[in-house]
């Protein structure tokens, strides 16, 4: 658990630096690409410059280059995926994802035996190498045009802050757990989080499908209902079935059983949050997303510290669920309020 916790602590730092550098967030790219606005090369240029700066900063702070290379890999991944989804090139999207997922265990495990945790990080960075060719192609197809940014700076800036807040929201738990509760607890929590992330794959796929279609004005009500129903089923699996299987696969992670039961309760709220995030992005109302993430973060940080000290990793899991529920409730309220006001205007 300790080594696993250390790895995820470093990955959380990489994640934050990545999205600080990533001016053109993936969601922004999806929305504007779906609307046929040739803004991709401009976002690529600025984000890659930011990534190089992040690389240098991480080197001076940690005296290591592996995490810097991973930052560049994450940035390239986000830029390319945003373009593919915005253009609705779902076959190419699947191809790139499969290549990266196949390379991850091959390179990660292969380099781990030679270089330890540092090798795993190098392996992750190299798994994104195929994405770089798409970046080069994008620069060839579209010229850099900063005027496209200035016309849309409000939405871009709000969405940048939303993405950055969301990233901090997703990584702050590791930054809190490591120094306060320890690497062993972080290891158990990180494994639980990885399992939850696997269970949210359906949500992520639906979400990435919904954004470009909703931005293009298509009706996605049936897909929303299907997403909610699938997550109700996954919650049942996470609460009752997964805890029965885990001890045979991860005998050293006994604390994970109760954590998974608790954290699986966040699956439905997270799917609801994704549904309304897509709606707000399509409407270019990223301010709602930013506020929702801020409220969720304001719940997560204090409760994670207090509950973590009082109840250990179980308290951390409870905090995670509370933050997810709060975010979903806020989005539902704001969506209904906006719909009501919009109908009055009409």
Identify what each model region corresponds to.
Residues 1-16, 155, 159, 175-197, ...:
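Interfacial/gating helices of multi-pass transporter permease domains
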Residues 45-161, 265, 269-272, 277-278, ...:
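Hydrophobic transmembrane helix module of multi-pass membrane transport proteins
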Residues 18-37, 196-218, 279-282:
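Helix-loop junctions and terminal segments of transmembrane helices
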Residues 64-68, 91-98, 148-180, 198-202, ...:
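Hydrophobic faces of transmembrane alpha-helices in multi-pass small-molecule transporters and flippases
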Residues 121-132, 194, 261-265, 298, ...:
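Small-residue-rich transmembrane alpha-helices that serve as helix-helix interface/gating elements
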Residues 21-22, 27, 44-68, 133, ...:
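Alpha-helical transmembrane segments of multi-pass membrane transport and lipid-handling proteins
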Residues 87, 114, 180-183, 217, ...:
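Helix-loop interface residues and adjacent transmembrane-helix termini in multi-pass membrane transporters
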Residues 37-46, 83-109, 162-165, 221-228, ...:
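Alpha-helical transmembrane segments of multi-pass membrane transporters/permeases
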């Amino acid at each position: 658990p300790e080594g696993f916790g250390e790895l995820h602590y470093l990955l959380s730092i990489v994640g934050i630096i990545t999205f600080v550098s990533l001016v053109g967030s993936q969601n922004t790219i999806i929305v504007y690409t779906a609307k046929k606005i040739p803004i991709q090369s401009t976002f690529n240029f600025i984000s890659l410059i930011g990534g190089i700066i992040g690389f240098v900063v991480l080197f001076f702070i940690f005296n290591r280059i592996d995490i810097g290379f991973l930052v560049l890999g994450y940035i390239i991944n986000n830029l390319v995926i945003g373009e593919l989804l915005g253009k609705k090139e779902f076959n190419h999207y699947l191809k790139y994802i499969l290549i990266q997922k196949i390379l991850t265990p091959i390179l990660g495990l292969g380099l781990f035996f030679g270089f330890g945790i540092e090798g795993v990080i190098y392996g992750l960075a190299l798994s994104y190498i195929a994405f770089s060719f798409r970046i080069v192609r994008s620069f060839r197809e579209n010229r850099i045009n900063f005027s496209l940014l200035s016309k849309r700076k409000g939405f871009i800036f709000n969405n940048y802050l939303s993405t950055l807040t969301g990233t901090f929201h997703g990584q702050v738990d590791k930054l809190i757990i490591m120094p306060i509760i320890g690497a062993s607890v972080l290891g158990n929590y990180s494994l639980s989080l990885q399992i939850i992330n696997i269970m949210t794959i359906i949500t992520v796929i639906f979400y990435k499908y919904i954004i470009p279609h909703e931005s293009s004005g298509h009706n996605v009500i049936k897909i929303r209902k299907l997403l909610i129903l699938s997550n109700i089923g996954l919650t049942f699996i996470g609460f009752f079935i997964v805890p029965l299987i885990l001890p045979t696969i991860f005998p050293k992670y006994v604390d994970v059983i109760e954590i998974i039961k608790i954290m699986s309760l966040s699956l439905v709220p997270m799917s609801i949050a994704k549904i309304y995030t897509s709606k707000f992005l399509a409407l270019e109302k990223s301010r709602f997303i930013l506020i929702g993430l801020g409220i969720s973060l304001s719940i997560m940080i204090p409760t994670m510290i207090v509950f973590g000290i009082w109840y250990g990793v179980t308290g951390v899991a409870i905090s995670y669920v509370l933050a997810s529920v709060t975010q979903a409730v806020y989005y539902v309220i704001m969506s209904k309020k906006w719909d009501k006001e919009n109908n009055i205007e009409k």
